[in-house]
Amino acid sequence: MARLMGVDLPRDKRMEIALTYIYGVGRTRSQEILEATGISRDQRTKDLTDDQVSQLRDYIEGNLKVEGDLRREVQADIRRKIEIGCYQGLRHRRGLPVRGQRTKTNARTRKGPKRTIAGKKKAR
């Protein structure tokens, strides 16, 4: 099992897919990495040589921000927006959607479970 950037890559998947298990690497970025290192997209993780694994590791460490570094940068960006008091920072602080989505209905992922409040009872 190949281990890159602290992530165990699945053995039986194609490299194009296996690299997406690293936080910050999607399909497109995965294809760019493989093209730059000269490794086939269709090669399986279990068939990688140690040389190829070290080549991948060197390329990713040298050119990309992934895993912990990327997570820290995203958190720092959110903290900065909260501190400067911009609209996006206020939305983050209140736990509401940041990018203009509606909140009258939906937005349950950000707002959490519904809190039932006592309302008017129906007249019979």
Curated annotation (Swiss-Prot):
Located at the top of the head of the 30S subunit, it contacts several helices of the 16S rRNA. In the 70S ribosome it contacts the 23S rRNA (bridge B1a) and protein L5 of the 50S subunit (bridge B1b), connecting the 2 subunits; these bridges are implicated in subunit movement. Contacts the tRNAs in the A and P-sites. GO terms for biological process: translation. This is Small ribosomal subunit protein uS13. The gene is rpsM. Signal peptide: none annotated. GO terms for molecular function: rRNA binding; structural constituent of ribosome; tRNA binding. Part of the 30S ribosomal subunit. Forms a loose heterodimer with protein S19. Forms two bridges to the 50S subunit in the 70S ribosome. Keywords: Ribonucleoprotein, Ribosomal protein, RNA-binding, rRNA-binding, tRNA-binding. GO terms for cellular component: cytosol; small ribosomal subunit. Pfam families: Ribosomal_S13. Residues 97-124 are annotated as: Disordered. Belongs to the universal ribosomal protein uS13 family.
